[in-house]
């Protein structure tokens, strides 16, 4: 068997090549072909593309069947025999690591970590530092997992006693790793990896005879070794999107991993965008195995259009800068870069640009348009307000008639119960300000529980303002903050509201220490009762989320607190199921250590880590205008590709270097760098646009109006144009 590499500038050409390969069925009619894809969006598009090639008759009405799509993580888990419960995953590793750290804080080698966690501090300082306990442990677990995946030789050297490469401030990590391996009592990742590679080379993986990896631009060192081993007994095809065959040829003799500071591969690249944006692809090329059966460049049938975008793509393809003999036509709008005054204005500009394109070209449909945002959670409400409100605003802006699908959002943003859970944990560790309580009351499950309408919430907000409610449930709740009076608390304000309802306008002014609130009519009796019940139930919920207890007790108390203040209808029962499923998954990952003692900041950090980056179901390629982050649809060709929010402070991601990351001290080629990853995403987007590329960014300060520079990659794109 062998390893085959197929390259093309566009993924549709790669998909057609893959379709031609899969059109020849395997010998076993019941066997499935295995295709590994980097993201759900690529999977959805690829399956639709293949359906026009596989199983069709005389037309394009085929079906993509007999093909199993997998993620790299699931394939590696199957090969390594870990399934979905890898004990060395960061989430699972955190719990035994927490146990090791707790037991080692008094030892001399752990002094650095002990000081950071306040083990030797006193009073308030000790409590504040101890609140970092879970968050720090989870971060260290992530570092250890990164070492094992990207540079497995490092933890292997630590177990062998070789720590020569480490500086003194990181000397605690090898000892902590050795203690963790002792507690785990199973093969550490590097030994498991070596055994798996040896077994694959000897016996094979029990996988289909033909495998394909489609659309990847970066592979860790361990995955490259596994794939090389798989190729010993299987036909392994790598389908790589690469913008320039000439650039690939220029780097063909570079092989092996080197220190990133010694990598001068960019000097062999002529086109500036290939040099500055394409580091991930260059490093992937040099990390691939040297023993390749075929290295094929697929050219496709189409040429680049005679537009500014076409010229840019043509120059990138040729790895050359060729401005001679070109004259930009006045009507050429194939590349649009808009400097706007705010995120809201960016979405307004996007709306007008897309409407103009749809009006000018009747063949253009919403499904031909892709909108990508580095920070989709910031832009999702703005996009929802500017698009797709046709059912609400019948005679509004024409853009409201467009069908828009927001994909790849986090669970917290799509499941209101999970959002309530996050808000309750924040309230439990805060002063319980009026704004926080009112924001929680706006949540749909809370509104359903207490019957709050929009008018009710307006009245409640007015009462809170007029009663001068600021923070704190009552005097007792304020005591830990050094404030011992009841004024401006929720108890004080509610007493004023209740007195205002109960007494007539001509009643005496003060009743003890309570001044009845004016303009609260007798018709508001029911609403004041519901408001009082809400605040009292919230107080009980918040009071239940205190102290130090086991993980199981914490999640049980949080679930009960959510039930106390929320209600969902039958149509939204999935929210409860999803909440229970996420909590059960946390418990399963903790395993036998689910009774580990945790504080409120620990449980808050745990759930935030667990839910962060866990996207919802794949709402891609549904026939609507798709809006998503920049990862899931990378390299997928669309007639119009829009990049919104490429601000200097957001893109590329400002990755603050972790001072405890041993890899960051001397980074090697092939290791993940988020800024290089974002730059590669921009290069992929340029190649994915077949007719129009639209980029927007904030070009003015929100407060002063002073000009702001574009993000550096956008400035480089402008220079190239």
Q: For each of these PLM feature ranges, what is it?
A:
Residues 1-721:
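Polyanion-engaging groove/track-forming segments
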